[in-house]
């Protein structure tokens, strides 16, 4: 049996990051965590491009556009959606998730889902570097692994 898996060596990888500006008090921390993890794993700072979009709903569009350029080995998406009093939360979360999956599946470039979806602000803060770690770090590590896995199929 052959086992195929990606490694966590970021040297030589080009990574795109799409960040939603809405709730930027959280998304900026996710971005910092992702950038730090990429650098610690050997990705050169000049090989990281960051695109800011208004919010989580717009992330799939920019992620797909970045992936279509074929300049990137992986795309990381970072956003925060916090439940409010209306059903808006459900629509944004569902469509963002579908769009991110579609971007990966139609382009052949790994697109990592890094949209933090929470019931309240406290949960979002916990996932941006306090009790629950930093989801930006997790996404960066996943991007490196998936980029290297994808390369092994070429």
UniProtKB/Swiss-Prot annotation:
It is an enzyme of class 2 (transferase). PANTHER family: 6,7-DIMETHYL-8-RIBITYLLUMAZINE SYNTHASE, 6,7-DIMETHYL-8-RIBITYLLUMAZINE SYNTHASE DMRL SYNTHASE LUMAZINE SYNTHASE. (2S)-2-hydroxy-3-oxobutyl phosphate binds at residues 85-86, 127. Optimum pH is 6.5-8.0. Belongs to the DMRL synthase family. The active site is at 88 (proton donor). The keyword Transferase applies. 5-amino-6-(D-ribitylamino)uracil binds at residues 22-23, 56-58, 80-82, 113. GO terms for biological process: riboflavin biosynthetic process. It catalyses: (2S)-2-hydroxy-3-oxobutyl phosphate + 5-amino-6-(D-ribitylamino)uracil = 6,7-dimethyl-8-(1-D-ribityl)lumazine + phosphate + 2 H2O + H(+). Pathway: Cofactor biosynthesis; riboflavin biosynthesis; riboflavin from 2-hydroxy-3-oxobutyl phosphate and 5-amino-6-(D-ribitylamino)uracil: step 1/2. CDD domains: Lumazine_synthase-I. InterPro entries: LS (IPR034964), LS/RS (IPR002180), LS/RS_sf (IPR036467). SUPFAM superfamilies: Lumazine synthase. Changing residue 88 to A: 10% of wild-type activity. 17-fold decrease in the affinity for the pyrimidine substrate, but no effect on that for 1-deoxy-L-glycero-tetrulose 4-phosphate. Catalyzes the formation of 6,7-dimethyl-8-ribityllumazine by condensation of 5-amino-6-(D-ribitylamino)uracil with 3,4-dihydroxy-2-butanone 4-phosphate. This is the penultimate step in the biosynthesis of riboflavin. Is able to use the non-natural R enantiomer of 3,4-dihydroxy-2-butanone 4-phosphate as a substrate, but with less efficiency than the natural S enantiomer. Cannot use unphosphorylated 3,4-dihydroxy-2-butanone, 3,4-dihydroxy-2-butanone 3-phosphate or diacetyl as substrates. NCBIfam families: lumazine-synth (TIGR00114), PRK00061.1-4 (NF000812). GO terms for cellular component: cytoplasm; cytosol; riboflavin synthase complex. Gene3D superfamilies: Lumazine/riboflavin synthase. GO terms for molecular function: 6,7-dimethyl-8-ribityllumazine synthase activity. The keyword Transferase applies. This is 6,7-dimethyl-8-ribityllumazine synthase. Forms an icosahedral capsid composed of 60 subunits, arranged as a dodecamer of pentamers. Can interact with riboflavin synthase, forming a lumazine synthase/riboflavin synthase complex, also designated as 'heavy riboflavin synthase complex', which consists of a trimer of riboflavin synthase enclosed within the icosahedral structure composed of 60 subunits of 6,7-dimethyl-8-ribityllumazine synthase.
């Amino acid at each position: 049996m052959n086992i195929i898996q990606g490694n966590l060596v970021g040297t030589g990888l080009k990574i795109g990051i799409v960040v939603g500006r809405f709730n930027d008090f959280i998304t900026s921390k996710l971005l910092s965590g992702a950038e730090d993890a990429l650098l610690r794993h050997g990705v050169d700072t000049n090989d990281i491009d960051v695109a800011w979009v208004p919010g989580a709903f717009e992330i799939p569009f920019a992620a797909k556009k970045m992936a279509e350029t074929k300049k990137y080995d992986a795309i990381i998406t970072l956003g925060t959606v916090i439940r409010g009093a209306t059903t808006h939360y459900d629509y944004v979360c569902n469509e963002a998730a579908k769009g991110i999956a579609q971007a990966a599946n139609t382009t052949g470039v790994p697109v990592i889902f890094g949209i933090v979806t929470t019931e309240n602000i406290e949960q979002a803060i916990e996932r941006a570097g306090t009790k629950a770690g930093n989801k930006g770090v997790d996404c960066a590590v996943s991007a490196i692994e998936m980029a290297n896995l994808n390369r092994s199929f070429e």
